[in-house]
Amino acid sequence: MVAALERGLSASKSFNFKRMFDSSSTKQQQSQTIVVENGDSHIVESNTPESQNSDSFVESPVESSLPMISPLTRPGKRSERQQADMEMMKDRFAKLLLGEDMSGGGKGVSSALALSNAITNLAASIFGEQTKLQPMPQDRQARWKKEIDWLLSVTDHIVEFVPSQQTSKDGVCTEIMVTRQRGDLLMNIPALRKLDAMLIDTLDNFRGHNEFWYVSRDSEEGQQARNDRTNDKWWLPPVKVPPGGLSEPSRRMLYFQKDSVTQVQKAAMAINAQVLSEMEIPESYIDSLPKNGRASLGDSIYKSITEEWFDPEQFLAMLDMSTEHKVLDLKNRIEASVVIWKRKLHTKDTKSSWGSAVSLEKRELFEERAETILVLLKQKFPGLPQSSLDISKIQFNKDVGQAVLESYSRILESLAYTVMSRIEDVLYTDTLALKQTLLAEETSDGGRTTETDSESAGSSNSGEEAEKHDPHSKTLLDFMGWNDNSSKGGDKPTKSPNLTPKKLSYLEKLENLNGFRSPKDRH
């Protein structure tokens, strides 16, 4: 029996060694296993993957034919999920390739605008429902990361040639040109991804936070929770805090998160402004501009900007910016004037209609003042819609890399503004709760103070009446009669009838004040 077992093992090994050099195109190979039953040995063939060891000894031919598959990585479910992702990716990139024109008639938009619209629409579908200060659901978060990676993968293939050195085997150094991701994408895409992760982490930090909560707007509690800040935002649920307000650690945490989100918003705003400034101004926008800056700004605004002394803060304080429409109109006018002045600075044709009598130095000064106003407007009104110049640049832009940077930074800026607004809603509600608590305490303290004052006043009046009725309560002054004289004479002071005040000169008054004269001369 032992000899037969050894012969079977040697035959199995030689057979497997021969099968290693057979056709390599198949991913599965046939292996043999020795099975001993009732003292007899026989060879059983089974199909196993290449990675499985052919010399493994198993106890049953059924177990040898079944591969070990984890329930978490079942091929059926995994292939279905991958197939669904593949179909979704094909659909997205087909729309991008066709320029959102599914008819294929060539009437679609440019690739840059199609990609910009795809990123904007994705952010609207993911973050448009973020009405509460709470973490994003896991399915939406996973969808955002997956689909934004698909859209950003286009920038991996936008490259530029840079010089590099290559050393051969014999030690000779040769200078060659290699491809690298374009400079602006290489610097800004990782930064924007970091800002994206910071915003999602900020929302995750509010997981399990139970010191503030949201109620339905139509409920009785929601009607009571309305305030001046949330009256116009009918789509947002009112926020509630405890009667005494938030605890000090929670309040500090909210202020810390607000500062972090503010930094994210400023960084995204800076990247967006830089990308927009590098985009070319379309000719259609230039053709729609008036001849000079005065016609664009109006006489009053132009006079304020071109004065010798100019303060941008005071300039904005004098204007009516009560509505969003008025602020946007002011921004459009100032941007148009900046474009006009820049074109006049760079134009060489002095006889054209762009020429004017204003010197180049003054025009540069006016341009700097107008750009300062634009920066202040962007800081004071971060949620302001895009201006006419920005919309025109995005619409006619042909650079795919700039389109991705502009849209990605814009949606991150918008998301940061949304998160900061939700934090400010909670802090405003907390401030109202604190004011109500302090007002209630002052009211209760005022009632106690009034009761104490009335009691003390009553005791003093009773004491005076007791002194009047008690003859033994008189003092020595009462017996001497000094109180009567002082009370009679205290009403009107006695005056000497014929005494006239001495008139002093200015020098004498000065000497009296400074004490230069002797005490004898002063009288």
UniProtKB/Swiss-Prot annotation:
InterPro entries: PRONE_dom, RopGEF. Residues 44-83, 442-523 are annotated as: Disordered. It comes from the Eukaryota. It is found in: Cell membrane. Residues 44-57 have a biased composition (Polar residues). Homodimer. The homodimer interacts with ARAC5/ROP4. Interacts with ARAC11/ROP1 and ARAC10/ROP11. Interacts with PRK6. This is Rho guanine nucleotide exchange factor 8. It comes from Arabidopsis thaliana. The lineage of its organism: Eukaryota, Viridiplantae, Streptophyta, Embryophyta, Tracheophyta. The gene is ROPGEF8.
